[in-house]
């Protein structure tokens, strides 16, 4: 993980660690002119590692985004941001996206009153995301909400931290996307 964030920069969904400043100066191979191929590859790798996708999953999302109306890049980022694991991370119910994936895989999360155990589940507007009524599930979410620094919540999401409930209001705006992509 640390090699990846050192190479690609800060990936907030991947880990809470940040790369040290000045690390580029120590490695002379990283400096110099960057080719177009290298820039595109690094941006693709940022997407993959930030959202925890395989190469095949990312290609499938790109195909869906190409078929949709609008800018392919914007539609792709909207698709990735509306995944259940990412929404849990944005709500603060998990400290990282891999942590959110684990919550979903272990069946702690309900969407509209039904257990969903697929992290790539695509949330829609007016979806209600809650935890199971079990004490263990609530404790996991409570620890995550308490330990996470309170960042500004995107306007397409609402959270009720006392009931451990989140609501998807609308599809995300491009200005709320947390990853800087070139």
Curated annotation (Swiss-Prot):
Annotated GO CC locations: chloroplast; small ribosomal subunit
- List localization entries: Plastid, Chloroplast
Entry keyword Chloroplast: yes
Q: Which InterPro entries match?
A: Ribosomal_uS4, Ribosomal_uS4_bac-type, Ribosomal_uS4_CS, Ribosomal_uS4_N, S4_RNA-bd, S4_RNA-bd_sf
- Domain of life of the organism in this record? Eukaryota
- Per UniProt, which keywords does this protein have? Chloroplast, Plastid, Ribonucleoprotein, Ribosomal protein, RNA-binding, rRNA-binding
The S4 RNA-binding domain sits at 82-143
- Tell me a Gene Ontology molecular-function term this record carries: rRNA binding
Primary location recorded for the protein, binned into one broad class? plastid
Q: Which BP terms does GO give this entry?
A: ribosomal small subunit biogenesis; translation
Q: Where is this region: Disordered?
A: 12-31
Recorded hits in HAMAP family, A to Z, give:
Ribosomal_uS4_B
Q: How does it assemble?
A: Part of the 30S ribosomal subunit. Contacts protein S5. The interaction surface between S4 and S5 is involved in control of translational fidelity.
The entry's family comment says: Belongs to the universal ribosomal protein uS4 family.
The entry's function note states: One of the primary rRNA binding proteins, it binds directly to 16S rRNA where it nucleates assembly of the body of the 30S subunit. With S5 and S12 plays an important role in translational accuracy.
The protein's name in its UniProt record = Small ribosomal subunit protein uS4c
Name the species this protein comes from. Answer: Hymenocallis littoralis (Beach spider-lily)
């Amino acid at each position: 993980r640390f090699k990846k964030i050192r190479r690609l920069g800060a990936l907030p969904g991947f880990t809470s660690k940040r790369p040290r400043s000045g690390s580029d100066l120590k490695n002379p191979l990283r400096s110099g002119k960057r080719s177009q191929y290298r820039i595109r590859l690094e941006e693709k790798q940022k997407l993959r590692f930030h959202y925890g996708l395989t190469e095949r999953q990312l290609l499938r999302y790109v195909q869906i985004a190409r078929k949709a109306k609008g800018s392919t890049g914007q539609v792709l980022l909207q698709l990735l941001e509306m995944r259940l694991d990412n929404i849990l991370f944005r709500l603060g119910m998990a400290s990282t996206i891999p942590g959110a994936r684990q919550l979903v895989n272990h069946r702690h999360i309900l969407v509209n009153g039904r257990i969903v155990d697929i992290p790539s589940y695509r949330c829609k507007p007016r979806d209600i995301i809650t935890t199971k009524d079990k004490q263990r599930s609530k404790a996991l979410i409570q620890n995550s909400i308490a330990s996470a620094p309170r960042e500004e919540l995107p306007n397409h999401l609402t959270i009720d931290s006392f009931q451990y409930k989140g609501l998807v209001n609308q599809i995300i705006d491009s200005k709320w996307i947390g990853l800087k992509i070139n």
